[in-house]
């Protein structure tokens, strides 16, 4: 049922776009790698004091590199691998399974007219992004 997956992914993108959701996926591994590399280079250049200076500079650089990289949630959702999209669709189907639709436009209209269903899908999406993707969510004004 690739059409159903596409319909539900478009619905989730519409909901997150309407709420202007952005998420920053934490790249702690990248930051740690930068900090470690800088400590190593500092140690080679300056000995033990160089390790301290390199680690400090690397830690600050790593934190700066990985902070504030917010992307729109619809973009993140569409970039998910197919297995993750199916997982998300299965969670959404538990909420919208009783609806009958023919295409993404009709499905979106049905859900957008039902505030309770919209809230449940938004909560499911927020939980998925924060827990599964380990991302921080921000809503634009």
Swiss-Prot record:
Subcellular location: Mitochondrion; Mitochondrion membrane; Endoplasmic reticulum; Cytoplasm, Cytosol
Protein name: Protein C19orf12 homolog
Keyword hit for Glycoprotein: no
Lineage: Eukaryota, Metazoa, Chordata, Craniata, Vertebrata
Membrane-spanning parts: 33-53
Membrane topology: Single-pass membrane protein
Major site of localization recorded for this protein: mitochondrion
BP-aspect Gene Ontology terms: apoptotic process; autophagy; mitochondrial calcium ion homeostasis; response to oxidative stress
InterPro entries: C19orf12 (IPR033369)
Family statement: Belongs to the C19orf12 family.
Keywords for this protein: Cytoplasm, Endoplasmic reticulum, Membrane, Mitochondrion, Transmembrane, Transmembrane helix
Listed GO CC annotations: cytosol; endoplasmic reticulum; mitochondrial membrane; mitochondrion
């Amino acid at each position: 049922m690739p059409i159903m997956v596409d319909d539900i992914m478009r619905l989730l993108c519409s909901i997150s776009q309407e709420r202007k959701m952005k998420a920053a996926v934490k790249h702690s591994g990248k930051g740690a790698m930068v900090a470690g590399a800088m400590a190593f280079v500092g140690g080679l250049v300056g000995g033990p004091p160089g390790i301290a200076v390199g680690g400090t500079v690397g830690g600050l650089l790593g934190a700066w590199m990985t902070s504030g990289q917010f992307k729109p949630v619809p973009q993140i959702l569409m970039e998910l691998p197919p297995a993750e999209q199916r997982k998300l669709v299965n969670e959404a189907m538990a909420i919208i399974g009783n609806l009958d639709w023919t295409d993404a436009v009709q499905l979106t209209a049905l859900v957008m007219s039902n505030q309770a269903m919209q809230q449940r899908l938004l909560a499911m999406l927020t939980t998925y992004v924060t827990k599964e993707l380990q991302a921080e969510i921000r809503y634009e004004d």
